[in-house]
């Protein structure tokens, strides 16, 4: 009888000790473990961060870092294999797809800011950029003041769209702002003469130049209107999942792996045209790799 009572006591104690762990378990990690699958959100034309190559394979700087995060998740769950499902997202739908559980993590060219933090979570920063303009070299566009009364394109649902509309209203510049569905469409609008300039993150603008029919026709100009931090989007209020992702990204940055990934996409020829963006690691990026963090600039 005493043995039965003792065994019962051990079982009850074990049950109580397990309860907090279950309560704190990451919903995302549980979903991945139970299904054996993780859904990765990616962009279709955010060169060189996340985009399709000419064989419709997803490639890019951010995509490679996301795969590092997947490896960290696999190790955390002690799984020999995790199936990855790739899902294309746009600037307009990416937040919703993370919120509703369709996408588990999205690493592309998404800015981490305080407004978005009310809707989703963000990983450690993966890139730091400035917002500028792309225009034809002979268009006479040197800075934002030159856009008064002209057609300007940007991509819908981006920080650049918000900044451009705010500038137009506050400075009464009389710009006609065109909001395209993605960066590829934005550049097409510029290329076909429907706009005189394309406002977007500087690295993305260089990416569009890399796939242009004649790259030498285009130039990136203007005073940066903001400094932004790109992060991988996660579901909000899942700190355990964020910790696993952050740990993997931090390891890549502090070990030198991220430097190699950066050099591959920003200092060497890249698909689809084989052009070199020739963007050396900035002081902001050097500081990030030395001391990874998830701070937003606004």
Residue ranges and their predicted role:
Residues 67, 79-146, 286-296:
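Acidic, polar ligand-binding/catalytic clefts
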Residues 64-72, 145, 150-151, 156-158, ...:
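Extended ligand-binding regions for polar small-molecule ligands
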Residues 44, 127-138, 210-246, 268-293, ...:
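Periplasmic-binding protein-like
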Residues 25, 79-96, 139, 177-188, ...:
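Short helix-initiation/N-cap motifs at beta->coil->alpha
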Residues 25, 31-105:
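Extracytoplasmic small-molecule ligand-binding "clamshell" domains
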Residues 39, 45-48, 58-75, 111, ...:
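Bilobed "Venus flytrap"/periplasmic-binding protein-like clamshell domains
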Residues 93, 107-118, 163-170, 184, ...:
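A ligand-binding cleft/hinge motif common to bilobed small-molecule-binding domains
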Residues 23-55, 140-141, 145-150, 285-298:
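Immediate post-signal peptide segment of exported/extracytoplasmic ligand-binding proteins
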């Amino acid at each position: 009888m005493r043995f039965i009572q003792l065994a019962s006591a051990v079982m009850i104690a074990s049950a109580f000790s397990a309860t907090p762990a279950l309560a704190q378990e990451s919903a995302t990690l549980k979903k991945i473990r139970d299904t054996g699958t993780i859904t990765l959100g990616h962009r279709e034309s955010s060169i060189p961060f996340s985009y399709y190559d000419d064989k419709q394979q997803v490639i890019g700087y951010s995509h490679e870092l996301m795969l590092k995060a997947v490896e960290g998740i696999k190790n955390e769950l002690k799984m020999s294999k995790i199936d990855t499902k790739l899902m294309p997202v746009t600037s307009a739908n990416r937040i919703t797809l993370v919120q509703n559980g369709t996408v588990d993590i999205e690493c592309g060219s998404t800015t981490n800011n305080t407004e978005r933090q009310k809707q989703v979570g963000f990983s450690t920063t993966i890139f730091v950029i400035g917002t500028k303009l792309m225009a034809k070299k002979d268009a006479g566009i040197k800075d934002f003041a030159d856009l008064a009364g002209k057609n300007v394109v940007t991509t819908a649902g981006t920080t650049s769209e918000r900044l451009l509309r705010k500038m137009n209203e506050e400075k009464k510049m009389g710009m006609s702002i065109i909001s395209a569905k993605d960066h590829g469409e934005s550049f097409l609008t510029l290329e076909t003469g429907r706009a005189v300039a394309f406002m977007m993150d500087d690295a993305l603008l260089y990416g569009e130049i890399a796939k242009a029919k004649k790259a030498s026709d285009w130039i990136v100009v203007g005073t940066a209107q903001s400094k932004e931090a790109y992060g991988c989007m996660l579901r909000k209020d899942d700190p355990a999942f964020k910790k696993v992702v952050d740990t993997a990204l931090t390891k890549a940055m502090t070990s030198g792996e991220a430097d190699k990934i950066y050099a591959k996409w920003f200092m060497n020829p890249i698909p689809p045209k084989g052009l070199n963006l020739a963007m050396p690691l900035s002081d902001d990026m050097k500081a990030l790799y030395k001391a990874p963090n998830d701070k937003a600039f606004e």
